[in-house]
Regions:
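Membrane-embedded helix bundles of polyisoprenyl
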Residues: 76-92, 98-140, 144-179, 192-212, ...
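Alpha-helical transmembrane segments of integral membrane proteins
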Residues: 74-78, 121-124, 159, 163, ...
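Transmembrane alpha-helices and membrane-interface helical segments
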Residues: 84-88, 131-138, 170-178, 274-280, ...
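Active-site lumenal/periplasmic loops and adjacent helix-entry segments of GT-C-fold
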Residues: 1-93, 98-130, 154, 158, ...
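Membrane-helix boundary/interfacial segments in multi-pass membrane proteins
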Residues: 4-5, 69, 113-124, 253-260, ...
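Membrane-interface helix-boundary motifs at transmembrane edges
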Residues: 91-95, 139-143, 179-189, 279-288, ...
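Periplasmic/ER-lumenal interhelical loops and adjacent helix-loop junctions
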Residues: 12-21, 47, 54, 189-192, ...
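Transmembrane helix-loop junctions in multipass membrane proteins, especially transporters and channels
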Residues: 2, 64, 142, 178-186, ...
Length: 341
């Protein structure tokens, strides 16, 4: 086989941070970090990266000097968990296991994953996200409580910034998937869903509260306000991200200079073609069709796109993995019953 080379943030942040967190925890220096600049809050500095990730904690039994080697193995585990978690959710949405398996692999190896290889902690979030949707479905359909509370807690601990976007998505998902088609059951299950989510947040408060207090002192979090339209170059970049595998973010191309927004909406084996076919073949009131088109519309406007980051002036598209999971489900449904489309 060939060689997979990592660069930029992976070598400058991910590996050094992993080694440093390992050393700090084992030495008991978990309140204040003297190794970052002139010193900073340890939890506030590293809770966005690796501190609360269950994948990172797999490396803790080993010496910090081993992390550079263990990180590659952990990367493989993240892809396996992403595929397994997606399969568990997709399997409930289609009849055939093969279609669910293909959809799970499309999600796990999506363009969003390959584009963000230098940001290894993004893959933690992608791997665990399908479990949140599965937990919501289990609560609504079967009344199972703990999966939702635990998945909310683990997702929050893994990355509180991405969790904010996931809460926004889950609110829209619940509305389109459960409330609109069946108002009575949707309203009956809604208070419990909110309470279980709040319980999960409470359990994750050990990292969440210090992180929020740390962020409040950062002036960049106060920069709100977005425009209504993307530029022509950004729209072309978005369209290309749906049709072709993403190019490297740190290398300029014909459309943009360096572009760190994580704009990638490509699935292996044809991009979003199968998802588009599904939208044309599905009923107009189909929940997946509605939700997919609604999220696709959100990608076209900075105002709607910014809702997943509380309208901060970042311009990031780092919620696209959620849309790609919907696209993977649409593709799985087409492959499950191709004659229907």
């Amino acid at each position: 086989g060939g060689k997979l080379l990592f660069m930029s943030d992976y070598l400058e942040q991910q590996i050094p941070f992993g080694m440093y967190i390992n050393e700090s925890i084992k030495s008991g220096q978990v309140y204040w970090s003297w190794g970052m600049d002139l010193g900073t809050n340890f939890i506030g500095a590293f809770s966005f990266y690796l501190l609360g990730s269950p994948f990172f904690w797999l490396s803790m039994p080993f010496p910090s000097s081993w992390y550079i080697y263990i990180a590659g193995v952990i990367y493989l585990i993240k892809y396996m968990v992403a595929a397994l978690a997606a399969f568990l959710w997709l399997r409930r949405q289609v009849n055939g296991e093969n279609a669910a398996l293909i959809g799970a692999l499309l999600y796990a190896f999506s363009g969003f994953q390959s584009l963000n290889l230098i940001f290894s902690h993004f893959h933690d979030v992608v791997a665990l996200f399908p479990l949140l949707l599965l937990a919501v479905d289990l609560w609504v359909q079967e009344g199972r409580r703990w999966p939702l509370a635990l998945s909310a807690c683990v997702s929050l601990l893994t990355n509180y910034v991405f969790f904010v976007g996931e809460v926004v998505f889950l609110a829209v998902y619940y509305l389109v998937r459960w409330l609109i088609p069946d108002v009575r059951r949707g309203l009956r299950r809604l208070p419990g869903c909110a309470a279980l989510g709040a319980l999960g947040v409470t359990m994750g408060a050990v990292l969440f509260v210090p992180s929020v207090l740390f962020l409040l002192s950062n002036p960049r979090t106060q920069q709100h306000g977005v425009s209504l339209l993307f530029s022509k170059e950004e729209l072309l970049y978005l369209v290309r991200s749906m049709l072709l595998p993403a190019s490297s973010m740190h290398s300029p191309d014909v459309l943009m200079e360096t572009h760190w927004a994580s704009c990638a909406l490509w699935l292996p084996m044809g991009g979003l073609v199968l998802a588009v076919i599904y939208c044309f073949g599905a009923k107009k009131r189909d929940w997946l069709r509605r939700l997919f088109l609604l999220c696709l519309l959100a990608t076209l406007s900075p105002a709607l796109n910014g809702a997943f980051l509380l309208w901060t002036q970042s311009g990031y598209r780092r919620w696209f993995y959620m849309l790609l999971l919907l696209a993977a489900l649409a593709a799985a449904r087409v492959l499950d019953v191709p004659e229907a489309y």
